[in-house]
Amino acid sequence: MQYAIAGWPVAGCPSESLLERITRKLRDGWKRLIDILNQPGVPKNGSNTYGYPD
């Protein structure tokens, strides 16, 4: 009989360490930030003067 406790690895399934989770989330976050900054276009702030009054 095989028991699995919530949050614990099951036999045959490798568990991910906390360091691996942290670094994966950091990499994903940096990739998302780069994608956001690389988007073309003009920021929308309700004016075409880039935040300066006319």
Curated annotation (Swiss-Prot):
Keyword Magnesium on entry: no
Signal peptide: none
One example of a Gene Ontology biological process annotation: viral latency
PROSITE patterns (UniProt xref): LAMBDA_PHAGE_CIII (PS00553)
Stored Pfam families: Lambda_CIII
Keywords, sorted A to Z: Activator, Viral latency, Viral latency initiation and maintenance
Mutagenesis or variant effect for R21P: Low cIII activity
Entry annotated with the keyword Nucleotide-binding: no
Domain of life: Viruses
Stated family: Belongs to the lambda phage cIII protein family.
Function of the molecule: Acts as a host protease inhibitor that allows the virus to initiate latency. Following infection, prevents protein cII degradation by inhibiting host protease FtsH (cII is a factor that initiates the expression of repressor cI, the major component promoting latency). Functions as a competitive inhibitor (and thus as alternative substrate) of host FtsH and thereby prevents binding of cII substrate. In turn, stabilization of cII transcriptional activator allows protein cI expression and thus initiation of latency.
Protein name per the record: Protease inhibitor III
